[in-house]
Amino acid sequence: MKTAIITDSTASIKEGEIQDVYVLPLQVIINGQDTYRDGKDIDYDRVYQLLKEHPQGLNISTSLPRQADLIELIEAIKDKYDRFVFLPLSKGLSGTYDMIVQAVKPLSTPKKEFVVLETSDIAISLKWLVQEVKALTDTNCPTKAIAEVVDQHKQSIFTAVTVKNLVQLRKGGRISGLKKIIATLLRVKPIIFFDKGVNTLSGKAFTFVQALEKIFTFVKSKFGDNFKIKRIGFCNAFTPVKAKEVKALILDFLHTNKITLQREIESSFITSAIIAHTGIDAFSISLLLDKNK
């Protein structure tokens, strides 16, 4: 059985980067009228520059992938594969999952299986999930077992995003718990926890180190003392120099607090669809945890 995996452009995967993995672009909309496909018609550098030129906020939003792009992709690859596994970003952030389900539901046959799995994920940790599922499909793993692995992954991931301000997040409507504490966040770094597939404004910090302390305090409260970090990801919307400085702070924090890693920190690019909501000078830490160690 040959399997295609289809994810979307928020997964930090470039087209052609992983064999048999295909990327469906979300849409980026500027000024309510100019529409671009994430990673195809517009990229991170262009959106970064636009955000930099509009420090008070840019009228930019995102939308579902075009259904026409989905159908075109399926038509292009349908004869090459027997099974199609879709791993879109969290349905708590986007209607992409529901759109794909409606589009491919009529296509499944005994000879062509179409499977859409809810990931509760985004960005580099969604890429990790794609890599894990790819390894399974390479061994002809049954669909039921793949779905179980996806469910286990959802229970083992956590992402925290620290942003410069809430300008773009407010414009994009991608965050809850905002009204009660917005007035207190004028001069601090808001911290957003992405947990169970949704964003929640969970704290604030004056420094990057303080943000890290809050992040790992939450991880400990959620997962307990007996866990190990299997993978850690660092995504950012900084200049290269600042990105290097913040990554060094993260490493120093982990070392000082005797938090051991099974791998080095993995850095990944942010897509235009994500920076449209975070704004510039934001970073995220994604963790894949082994809770049983």
From Swiss-Prot:
- Pfam families under this entry? DegV
* InterPro entries linked to this entry: DegV (IPR003797), DegV_C (IPR043168), DegV_domain_contain (IPR050270)
Its domain of life reads Bacteria
- Does this UniProt record's set of keywords contain Iron-sulfur? no
Keywords from UniProt, A to Z, are: Lipid-binding
Q: Where does hexadecanoate bind?
A: 62, 94
Query: Which sequence ranges are marked TM in the entry?
Result: none
Which part of the chain is the DegV domain?
Answer: 3-289
Q: What SUPFAM superfamilies does this protein map onto? A: DAK1/DegV-like (SSF82549)
Write down what this protein is called. Answer: DegV domain-containing protein MG326 homolog
Q: Which organism is it from?
A: Mycoplasma pneumoniae (strain ATCC 29342 / M129 / Subtype 1) (Mycoplasmoides pneumoniae)
